[in-house]
Amino acid sequence: MIPVSHFHPLSVHFPIALITVAFLFDVVSLLCKKEPCLSTAGYYLQILGMLGAIAAWGTGHFLAGTTQMEGEAMQVKGQHELFATLSLIAIIVATVARIIMVYQKTENTFYKYIPFGLSLLSVLFITVTGYLGGKLVIDFMIGL
């Protein structure tokens, strides 16, 4: 049986990849306007990434309650939790805004840059979150 402490590491990698690739598809879509399929693919990847991020955040929140830390490890854990929450909020707001725009058929207006900016912000937050999570594992051997 898989230990409970492994659920978070198992669940974080897919949303990271999905959200990052969705953002990259959107960047290329902005540069190559003749390829609407890139934006559509980015849209669906972003939705899947958001759902995965919710699961990853939930498993991390659960794991945080089962792991005892102190000192610098506790500080890094707090920063990791903060950036994970900021990542989740940014990707949820970006995805909901994008879904609304698709259903209102306003995704080809200037307003498309709002979810795009939030997606960029979420990718930046995810990068910091991943760095801090790696620091917890490598420097403090948390989760091993």
Whereabouts are the PLM-identified features?
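Polytopic transmembrane helical bundles with strong interfacial aromatic enrichment
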Residues: M1-L144
